[in-house]
Amino acid sequence: DEYGNATKVGVADWQDLIYQDGFSQEYNISVSGGSRNGSWHSFSGNYLKQQGIIKESGFTRYSIRANMGRKIKSWLDMGVNISFSHTDTDFSRTNSNDYGVIRSALVFPTTYDPSDDETLNSDELSWLASNPYAYINSAKDNLKSNNVFTSSYLEIKLFPFLKFRQNLGINYTNRERGTYYGRRTSEGSEANNINGKAG
């Protein structure tokens, strides 16, 4: 108030507000078979989703694989393997020596009300730590990755004791990472003359 006395004091458990119970689920499916003419095949798929113990963090992956082969002659085999995987990772800002959501939750005063917009939008403690809520709600660090692998083989039986096998494989990986820090985080703070930061 006008006399310098606190008119509103919150009681914030910042660690409780940034942490959550981690949750993981995984599913697998596979099908395989063959025929009398010497051909065979197998197909499989996998889905994995992990929720991080810090809110807004997690990992998702799905993958598929196909293997096919055939005995062309009694002395000749050939086959092909194909796999594809996609991963999506949401990182939390925990690898900073000076700032980061974990350090901020440990040192940010508990007398601030996390439900008050003035707390979220305040710069007066930027020298100490960023508001933990700011890292949860306005900081993003996402990595998407795609991987394709194909291989084929040709195997020739030259003698009962000797085989020749040729393998050919191609591996392709694509990664895309994007980061954004809102202006209430140390990385994107107005104190650093930055109104948000993207990368």
Report the location of each language-model feature.
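Surface-exposed loop/interface segments of Gram-negative outer-membrane beta-barrel transport/assembly proteins
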Residues: 1-11, 38, 52-59, 63-149, ...
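A generic beta-sheet turn/junction motif
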Residues: 33-38, 47
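An active-site-proximal structural segment forming one wall of the substrate-binding cleft
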Residues: 162
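Short strand-turn segments of transmembrane beta-barrel domains in outer membranes
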Residues: 2-30, 45-54
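Residues on the lipid-exposed face of transmembrane beta-strands in outer-membrane beta-barrel proteins
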Residues: 29-33, 64-70, 150-156
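Outer-membrane beta-barrel channels and translocator barrels
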Residues: 24, 36-37, 73, 157-159
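Catalytic cores of large soluble enzymes that bind and process phosphate-bearing ligands
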Residues: 19, 23, 140-146, 150, ...
